[in-house]
UniProtKB/Swiss-Prot annotation:
Stored NCBIfam families: NuoI, PRK05888.1-1
GO cellular component, one term: plasma membrane
Positions with a binding annotation for [4Fe-4S] cluster 2: C67, C96, C99, C102
Cofactors: [4Fe-4S] cluster
Its EC number(s): 7.1.1.-
Subcellular location: Cell inner membrane
Reactions that this protein is recorded to catalyse: a quinone + NADH + 5 H(+)(in) = a quinol + NAD(+) + 4 H(+)(out)
Molecular function GO terms recorded: 4 iron, 4 sulfur cluster binding; iron ion binding; NADH:ubiquinone reductase (non-electrogenic) activity; quinone binding
Protein name: NADH-quinone oxidoreductase subunit I
Organism: Syntrophotalea carbinolica (strain DSM 2380 / NBRC 103641 / GraBd1)
Taxonomy of the source species: Bacteria, Pseudomonadati, Thermodesulfobacteriota, Desulfuromonadia, Desulfuromonadales
Amino acid sequence: MSLWKDIKGTILPFWVTLRYLFRRPVTVCYPERKQTPAPRYRGRLVLTRDPDGEERCVACHLCSAACPVDCISMQAAEREDGRRYAAWFRINFSRCIFCGLCTEACPTLALQMTSEYELATRELLQVIYEKDELLIDGCGKNAEYNFYRRAGIGVVAPRGANPGESSPEDVKSNLP
């Protein structure tokens, strides 16, 4: 009985090898043929623009606060009309784990993940992307969304003087 087990244990792996020898290979020659990632694949991060063509990022620092590995950094600045923007924006992809928490935290939908997965390089400084490398020309996944149409720019007039706003109630007039 032991001899039969030994023979079977020797011949069975050869049979499996012969069976797979004449099948088509399942590996893909990567540089020549690129696979299409899944629809919800989380790849390289990009900064998008609003429908008016301006940057969506308002430098609120929510993305950098949500990042568990602290790979996002930026400097906030303000334009003359009161609109905030990121003076510089930097993502270190050597630290990024592509979790997507930064895109969920972004209130303006400025930071979005693409299906781009080719980020390999031999130089460490080439995986640190600056704002000009992250900013794309399009609106990204939510083309119709415009944060400033919904949120507006900072209020400078007193309460009740803005369009569509009622004047505040005088609470002292309600006292006896």
